[in-house]
Amino acid sequence: MPFSNSHNTQKLRFPAEDEFPDLSSHNNHMAKVLTPELYAELRAKCTPSGFTLDDAIQTGVDNPGHPYIMTVGAVAGDEESYDVFKDLFDPIIEERHGGYQPSDEHKTDLNPDNLQGGDDLDPNYVLSSRVRTGRSIRGFCLPPHCSRGERRAIEKLAVEALSSLDGDLSGRYYALKSMTEAEQQQLIDDHFLFDKPVSPLLLASGMARDWPDARGIWHNDNKTFLVWINEEDHLRVISMQKGGNMKEVFTRFCTGLTQIETLFKSKNYEFMWNPHLGYILTCPSNLGTGLRAGVHIKLPHLGKHEKFSEVLKRLRLQKRGTGGVDTAAVGGVFDVSNADRLGFSEVELVQMVVDGVKLLIEMEQRLEQGQAIDDLMPAQK
C-alpha cells in the first residue's frame, strides 16, 4: 500500500533536482503545473501541522493519469495547505474550475426555495436523484494527514451531532469496524456506502491509513439522508431517493446540512470555509460548494448519439457510468451531474442539472421517434 515518504527530512540533503519526481509520462493537473523550479521553491516549506509539498503531490506522482477523466494529482492535508502551497494549488484550481482566479470570491446559496421546478423530472427516464457535498471541521487535519486520535475525535463529534437530528432525519450510526463483510458489501452494492479503500487516490495520498478505524456511515431510517464519516473528507453529506423529484432531494439536503452545521457550532466547532475557496475539502476538485447533484438517467438512444458529449459540455454537465467514475453505462443508464463546484452557488448548480436533464429527456424522446435533435442543441452555458 503506497504511502507518502515526505516525513523523511534527510531528503533536504539532496539537491532539489535529485528529489524532483519523474513526471514525463503523467497526465494530471499537478504534473502540468509542477516544474523543477517550483518544486525547489516549495519543497522545504510545511504547514503548521507538518504537511509538505511531497505529501500534497504523492497521489499524482503514483497515479500518472486516468483514461476517462483529467485527475487533479494533488491533495490538501489541512486548511493551511491551500495557502502555504498556493503557487501549486492556485494554477490547478484555475485550470480545474474553468479559469477561477485567485482574486475571485465564491458564493453560497442553500435556500431550496430559490430552485425553480425540479419536482417533475420524468420517472420513466430518471431512476434516482442525489445531491452530495463534503465538509471539513476546522482545527483538524484533513484525511491524508490526520492522526488516529484526530480521526476518532472527528467520529465522536460527528456521531454526537448527528444523533440530535430528529423527524425525517432521525437515524443511527454504523461503524465500519463493527459491520460484517456481507453488511458492508450490501450497503456498497445499494450505493449507500463508500467503497473499500482500493481507489488509488485514497491509497497513495495516505487517506486509507488505519482502515477501517473511525470510519462509518450514519443514515436516517429510510436511507434518504446519509453522512459518510472519515473517508476522503471528514464528512460527506448525501440526500438521495428513487425517481425524479430533485426538489425534494435538494430541500432535504439543505435542511439536514444546515442543521448539522448548527449542531457543530453549538459544540464550538465550525466548518472550514473562506470567501475565496468556499468550503475547504481534501481534493481541489471539490472546493467551493463540494456539491454534486446527479441523476441516474436512461438514455439508450442519446447515449449512443455522436453529439451526446457536446450536448453535456454545453449544459455544463458530466457523465459517469452506472456505477460511478470508473464504470461503463449499463443498459443505457448514465450518472449525469454538474461539472462545476466552485464559482457557482449550490442552487445554481442544481438548477443547471434540473434544466439540463429536462432537455436530455426531450432529446431522448425525439430519438425514440426517429426524429432529429439538431434544433434542440443548446447554446454554451
UniProtKB/Swiss-Prot annotation:
Q: In which tissues is it expressed?
A: Expressed in hippocampus and corpus callosum (at protein level).
Gene inactivation phenotype reads: Conditional deletion in adipocytes leads to defective adaptive thermogenesis: defects are caused by abolition of the futile creatine cycle, thereby reducing whole-body energy expenditure and leading to predisposition to obesity.
Location comes to: Cytoplasm, Cytosol; Mitochondrion; Cell membrane
Residues modified as Phosphothreonine: T35, T322
Q: What top-level branch of life does the organism fall under?
A: Eukaryota
Q: Which reaction does it catalyse?
A: creatine + ATP = N-phosphocreatine + ADP + H(+)
Task: List the GO terms this entry assigns under cellular component, sorted alphabetically.
Answer: cytosol; mitochondrion; myelin sheath; plasma membrane
Q: Where is this cross-link: Glycyl lysine isopeptide (Lys-Gly) (interchain with G-Cter in ubiquitin)?
A: K45, K107, K381
What residue stretches are annotated with the Phosphagen kinase N-terminal domain? 11-98
Modified positions (Phosphotyrosine) are Y125
Its UniProt domain note says: The internal MTS-like signal (iMTS-L) mediates targeting to mitochondria thermogenic fat cells.
Q: What is this protein called?
A: Creatine kinase B-type
Organism of derivation: Mus musculus (Mouse)
Phylogenetic classification of the source organism: Eukaryota, Metazoa, Chordata, Craniata, Vertebrata
